[in-house]
Amino acid sequence: MKDLLKFLKAQHKTEEFDAIKIGLASPDMIRSWSFGEVKKPETINYRTFKPERDGLFCARIFGPVKDYECLCGKYKRLKHRGVICEKCGVEVTQTKVRRERMGHIELASPVAHIWFLKSLPSRIGLLMDMPLRDIERVLYFESYVVIEPGMTNLERSQLLSEEQYLDALEEWGDEFDAKMGAEAVKALLGNMDLNAEIDLMREELEETNSETKRKKLTKRLKLVEAFLLSGNNPEWMILSVLPVLPPDLRPLVPLDGGRFATSDLNDLYRRVINRNNRLKRLLDLAAPDIIVRNEKRMLQESVDALLDNGRRGRAITGSNKRPLKSLADMIKGKQGRFRQNLLGKRVDYSGRSVITVGPYLRLHQCGLPKKMALELFKPFIYGKLEARGLATTIKAAKKMVEREEAVVWDILDEVIREHPVMLNRAPTLHRLGIQAFEPVLIEGKAIQLHPLVCAAYNADFDGDQMAVHVPLTLEAQLEARALMMSTNNILSPASGDPIIVPSQDVVLGLYYMTREKINAKGEGMYLAGPAEAEKAYLTKNAVLHARVKVRITQYAYDEQGNLSSETGLIDTTVGRAILWQIVPKGLPYSLVNTEALGKKQISTLLNTCYRKLGMKETVVFADQIMYTGFAYAALSGVSVGIDDMLIPKEKYTKIAEAEAEVAEIQEQFQSGLVTAGERYNKVIDIWATANEQVAKAMMDNLSVETVINRDGEEEQQKSFNSVYMMADSGARGSAAQIRQLAGMRGLMAKPDGSIIETPITANFREGLNVLQYFISTHGARKGLADTALKTANSGYLTRRLVDVAQDVVITADDCGTHAGITMTPLIEGGDVKEQLGDRVLGRVVADDVLKPGTDEVLAPRNTLLDEKWCDLLEDNSVDQVKVRSVVTCENDFGCCKFCYGRDLARGHLINTGEAVGVVAAQSIGEPGTQLTMRTFHIGGAASRAAAENNIQVKSTGSMRLHNAKFVTNSESKLVITSRASVMTVIDEFGRTKESYKLPYGSILSKGDGDSVVQGDTVANWDPHTMPIITEVAGRVQFVDFIDGVTVSRQTDELTGLSSIVILDAAERTSAGKDMRPTVKLVDDKGNDVMIPGTDMPAQYFLPGKAIVQLEDSALVGIGDILSRIPQESGGTRDITGGLPRVADLFEARKPKEPAILAEITGAVSFGKETKGKRRLIITPSEGQPYEEMIHKWRQLNVFEGEKVECGDVIADGPEAPHDILRLRGVHAVAEYIVNEVQEVYRLQGVKINDKHIETIIRQMLRKVTIVKAGDSEFLPGEQVEFSRVNIANRKLEADGKDIVTFSRDLLGITKASLATESFISAASFQETTRVLTEAAVSGKRDPLRGLKENVIVGRLIPAGTGFSYHQRRQNQRNAELEPVAPQVDAEQASQDLAALLNAGLSDD
């Protein structure tokens, strides 16, 4: 019997599917799902609690209410399985069929499906080529629509009002056919010939010229083709049969007191059934048309509400005024099916409790309370008790555990040994938020956590809680141990730096231990080794800080991995020698023997240990460091008292000086010498400087102390002040915080980011007065409000990033591409922000790296650059390397190993199946909460170092100018006349050391290739105005300068000099609106002077607000300034910072006023102007000129006649990433986004590897727009996956046909997530209704490639350990598809062989 059952069950196995397809259901299909028609709106009999027959809970249709028992009770027990009771008609089977059996309702009149009607763009409307308004009027019985015009002059699908219809009836009788309601729409859809429509549209597409029409046609064509290809029938968008959800999925639960709690769906279904039955009765009675019509309309509305309540008209509400939850609401949103039940499930075998410190634990351990362990490991304990024969049955074992007998604890110890548990702290922002530990049983009720993993969990012990999960199966335990054990996660996946780094107490202890003190007890001793040093310390013959000589043995590994040692006397301190005892062999003593061992140095120590000696040593070392640190922190006795905050004596004089300066500025302002804005800025500058000076004085005062040395002389040494030591070691606090404690609090910001000009001169030691306290609260409250917003925004960013990147998995070893991105060191101004070595570390070289100036290959192609290679590049002064990148990987799905490079968390080449997309998303999203929300205003002490007005080089070398145009002025200095010029300083090896932007009009004292010495000032400019510089010499001639109309004269009161100011267009009278004030240059005869190398006259148009300080017909030389444009407006543009900036970059949002870039290479000219815009024309040397209209208020960087390259900046502003992609290509846009995102994170001191950002960029670039379709089935203008085009092109090329040409698109992460191939993934992200509607119409097939889809359908994900499972299935499937070779048994084979041989012999 059992085997029979097994056989029956096997038929329904749904494991073996490779894809999920979604489509429209035909009425027949709905009937085939159904187990019977629901005819009555009744649910259950409230007296007997039995379901009503033919009602919404009918047992005959949906199955029995009790297991193996029919409704009337005639058949009970298993033996009657499968019998259908003749009395009540119920099949005797399990109740759970009530979760899967569906019913149906035969609708008396067809009804349109609201999703295909109202979800924009309306599918029904697009298909019928009618406006949505018109279709609605037909469906809701307001108008007639012509279905068959016959011989009349009406047209098909023409709308007729009631009167028009009656007139037509009178005129033509029944020659034509017109109807209303869903029947009419159904008839129209049924009459469509899709093939004919397609041919018609393709013809129209050939002929049409208008862009809008072409777009509309393409949309409609794609829809019609989708219907044809998917085998969906357009009529199926109109429902004539409505499926009914199985009753256990819309339960009715009796509450005590005779009331019922019910799912909203039951109410909605009841309304549909009531109206449907009433309509049937009305039709039978042949009621008047108007009544029937009203009933049909009501039926349509009730079905609309059932499918998607609130989409049309007001939402139907229940008894408590709350809108009812329809079928659509069930699946969408955070509480919907996708996100609540399919992507996030609850787990059994878990517990949670408060965490506390376990400083004596080893790194791989955690303390688990006995109570919790007993509960969590129950099944294992029961099993063990039974296996030992201590309990006869599970029930007996249960009893023993409940009584907590002595033997149970012994068994628990055994069970727990070597059985890892997983600890998780919410919010889990990156993969280190869940790690595995070996449990150690402890008393008490709190989980004990190892202090070093706190950084990864972002945990502290102020009441945080953590959850424990038990991996049950052997595979799960193995994975937890091999992959998730805390000892295997020493490096952060975001940056590749150690994340198991001591902080706070431990750092302070080690720092204190390794400091030196002058003339301490025991100074000058000679010690035989670390052990003797420790002895000396313990016997109080020497203190920790005493400077002594110790005999130290250092070990080092050579290339072959052999240990060699050398011993020598080293000047050091007692503390450092003691610390050396725990340092593993193979590290140099210099790492310990430093001025002070702060947090950075300890991090370096651990990193070096990991790279040189491997994981095991590092783990042991980290634990030892922690124990030592804690011990010596306790011995140090560092604590904070109010006297430790030393206030510098100079503070009060500095403040008095600043106050005097402010008073002076105030006087100047009152006498009208400075404007309000200037006064404000100057006051803030004064206070910012004063604050800096007080802070400096305070730190100088705190950081050194004077002591008497052995010779009795005074000497300076680093201070042992507690506050200073905490900050200096990196344990807690920073210079900025000490400044508030003992310096002055300084300037405070208002919530809008502007700075209050009254500073807080007091510090926390002195205490604030009421006014100062009030000013402080202003910004502080903003900070708290920001934090709450930030957390939500950051979480949403992470969610979008994960969604867009989830299907990037390492799928292949090498895609073989030669493409890549060129890496150079990041230089801003005079300092190197990031060395080349740091940027290319862990990358794979795309082309051979040559030694500069030779043909010698330093690093061959496909080398993984590790630390040693990077040092080699550094030694040979290589200044650019082309490395492979995720962005340029040519794999169709996922990415290859070489393009990704090193697995940052493990330190070797990445493995296949690694889910690099999700790791990238987590790495970018996790620090999100640390980023600021604020938009920075320039003009605050925060960001205003005095405006730059010159360049002073910081290193010696030679100077280079890049894409610079310049003229030489009368003083034979160079004046820059180009916009995007860059000046770099190069050392003798040709490496770029510094890089500066040169603004237009800067005056250089050195030329290209000249040598410069450190400290030289090589360029100056005026930061507050933008000059207009003449490129020719001649006499000035003013054009359109009319006093009071286009210009006004102003005389400076102080200097008596007069200047001419051009009026803004808004200030001019109507007469001056069309005039363009221009400065022309003429020679002595009055003829125009030409710009050298062109036939353009030299004339300079002046924008509004420009100031001219020349008189008409003055003589000017080359490079002289004709006019200045004040740069006030430009300076106060808000710079969006922090989190919003990162979100903007990844969403690829166009900035408000983007930079205007040249679309083609050519010469600039201006054409006819309109009211608010001017016409920019770029004429190439050959081909069509390009025109663009630009707002007049945009300041242009080009003058008439200038030559521009494609992608040059014409008007300044933030660059739009789409423009960069279009004009400069994929590499440029990738570099732009990477640098901009890194800029934000670098400001916050967060380190993220470029790889992660590139992974996201790859996903943003995965769509292309078809330009020419070639011989493919794509349409021009269609947006397609990059991979699909590549696959199609390879096939076309192989067949020798025309390939597709396309342009790459940049999509924001939200758009990109919704545009994935997988509709399941897109639907579970956002806009569920729209995604599913679109997918259903085009009959989409989801190949289940990404991680999310597989989680939703309940499979292993195709990454990590699940990767091999999916590959195995794939291979199995391919094997099934291949023709099977005929099987031959051994005897047959030997006979065949003999026959062949005989044949061969008999031939002779």
From Swiss-Prot:
Zn(2+) 1 binds at residues 70, 72, 85, 88. It catalyses: RNA(n) + a ribonucleoside 5'-triphosphate = RNA(n+1) + diphosphate. Mg(2+) binds at residues 460, 462, 464. One of its GO terms (cellular component) is DNA-directed RNA polymerase complex. InterPro entries: DNA-dir_RpoC_beta_prime, DNA-dir_RpoC_beta_prime_bact, RNA_pol_asu, RNA_pol_N, RNA_pol_Rpb1_1, RNA_pol_Rpb1_3, RNA_pol_Rpb1_3_sf, RNA_pol_Rpb1_4. Zn(2+) 2 binds at residues 815, 889, 896, 899. It comes from Photobacterium profundum (strain SS9). NCBIfam families: rpoC_TIGR (TIGR02386). Belongs to the RNA polymerase beta' chain family. The RNAP catalytic core consists of 2 alpha, 1 beta, 1 beta' and 1 omega subunit. When a sigma factor is associated with the core the holoenzyme is formed, which can initiate transcription. One of its GO terms (molecular function) is zinc ion binding. Its EC number is 2.7.7.6. Its cofactor is Mg(2+); Zn(2+). Coiled coil: none annotated. DNA-dependent RNA polymerase catalyzes the transcription of DNA into RNA using the four ribonucleoside triphosphates as substrates. Keywords: DNA-directed RNA polymerase, Magnesium, Metal-binding, Nucleotidyltransferase, Transcription, Transferase, Zinc. This is DNA-directed RNA polymerase subunit beta'. Binds 1 Mg(2+) ion per subunit. Binds 2 Zn(2+) ions per subunit. GO terms for biological process: DNA-templated transcription. The keyword Cytoplasm does not apply.
